[in-house]
Amino acid sequence: MPVSKHMVVYPYFILLLILIAAAILRVVGIDFGLPMAYHNDEPVLVLACQQFFSGDFNPHNFLYPSLLMYFMHAVQRIYFVLAGGPVDLTMLYLLSRLTVAAFGIGCVIFVFLLGKKLAGSTAGLAAALLLSLSPLHVIHSHYATTDVPLSFFVLWSIYQALNLEERGRWCDYILTGLAAGLTVSIKIPGAAVFVPILIAHLIRIQRLEKMNLLRQCQEYYRRWPARSVLFLLPTFTATAAYLFFKHFAWFADRLLRRIPVDLWQTYHDEIVSHLAAAAGKYALLFGGGLLLIVFIWPIWRVRLGRLFTLFAAAVVAFFASTPYAIIDFKQFAHDFLFQMVVSQTTWSGTFADKAPALVTNFGYLLGDFGPVFLFFVVLAAARAIIQKDVPLFLFFSFGLFYYFYLGTWKLMFDRYMVPLLPILAVLAAIGFVWAAVELASFLCAKWRIPRWCTYGILTLLLFMPPAVGMGKEAVDFDRYLLKKNTRTLAFEWATANLPRQAKILREQYAPEIEIDGFDVINVNFMFNDSVDADYVYKNKIDYLIVTDKLWSRPMQEDGVVQPRSAYQRIVDYADLLWSIAPTPANPGPEIHIYRIRYPDPK
């Protein structure tokens, strides 16, 4: 049957409409809160971009790698060159958010391409529509943070891995390595993309060499039994890793002399306790990984040069886009350790009332996609395994590994699930399309019901209701951003009523009145027992600003979950001066402003 021009153009016209809807959902309200940053991770990136205008391109902060900062700065440079005028912090925030929104729209495009590659244009369009409406994806596309850009680079890496599995050219290995390296340079957990990449490499070799993977490996070791001694390596590695992390306190002092990072001293107990508790996990990770490498070594050694080239390209891409990880290694090591080790202990009280990470994270995904679409996700994954659909299995292998890896974390922010949303969108679309085709074929053969009738009914009954629900949640969030937040109202009151010469202490969710010239101490999550009357008297604090976003969270000290008693003691040394609670018209946190009550001099 000849393909008409209209049949080729039609899907791209629908995609254009979806992209317009995705852009509207991600741009409406994007200037919320400015000149304040309502998301506490935004200043990490935006203030680094501001510093770049001075000519110093060292971010001096490696809580995240640097690639996204440089992307944002490039956009900001272009804008200020064209628009002229001084560098304005408010505009830096807005441009940074727009950069992330653009990555969010790019994710929708990649989802269409991947869906089309795996199951045709209909699945690609359905996947693009689902991701464009995803509430969690829409929410985090408004923030100048790393999660949505990470999703974009994850999709690019998976797309390249599929090309590697399909064609296996040298350029495919190089491009895949570059994509993976840049993914890690957005956010370290992006290293999970190496799972589908390695699977793609193994499948490619097995197909080209016409190998039976299991039989080839068995034959390799049966022919030369002495090679079986290699299996002692994983056992030794797992044992050594377990003993090292379990007794890390013994190594800590020696490591401190070798790697003089002050974090070892400041958070010595937290690091030791975390690594000791995770000794079994690390032993399983190192031992299991090496066992897999040893067992399938007969496959690894084929075309090993191409695999090394891929990893070399990844390393070059990472350090080219995060160059100060080498130049300023001490700061990089400090922040990397803090992000991957210390933050897993000091913030764990925040999630003390949550279920384990695997359950909590599943709840985030269920709340975003709903049970119907998650059913189609499971259907597509099961079908891929049963029918040995290699490309589709390769595609969702990232999602499986990433989900279970983050299931070992104590931090359970919903934003950590953002890279899984495109994976779920594609799987849900493929599962729905497959179910619709199979059911339509059955009904057409048995009762001669027209296929278009079955497609229409299934779309109206099973696809549209949950999709409309997702879209409504996304629109509700945009409407939320358009309302005047309690932080903005508190900012306006404080800047109009507090003395300019006053010294103010605020916790991290309180309005950022320092941008209006006030002398402010920001104590972030450390607003715990260290903040008391002696602390405020010693630092000559005049006013205190706190919110229920932090005082309502428990904290964890020495493994014991307890309320933040520092907030309960505020009334012992301060008087409530002003407060505001959220309303439907003015959402946001409850905010209290206190005046410090100094004792009468004797």
Label every PLM stretch briefly.
Residues 25, 45, 64, 70-71, ...:
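Transmembrane-lumen/periplasm boundary regions of multi-pass, lipid-linked membrane glycan transferases
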Residues 531-534, 538-602:
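Aromatic/acidic, Gly/Pro-rich catalytic loop(s) in extracytoplasmic/lumenal soluble domains
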Residues 20-23, 90, 94, 98-118, ...:
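Transmembrane-helix motifs of polytopic, lipid-linked glycan transferases
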Residues 3-7, 116-118, 122, 157-173, ...:
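Membrane-interface transmembrane helices that cradle and orient dolichyl/undecaprenyl
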Residues 140-141, 147-150, 183-188, 192-195, ...:
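Hydrophobic/aromatic-rich transmembrane helices and adjacent perimembrane loops
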Residues 431, 456-484, 506, 512-513, ...:
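Transmembrane alpha-helical segments
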Residues 12, 18, 84-87, 106, ...:
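Transmembrane-helix signature of polytopic, membrane-embedded enzymes
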Residues 110-113, 149-166, 172-180, 197, ...:
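Specific aromatic-rich, kink-prone transmembrane helix
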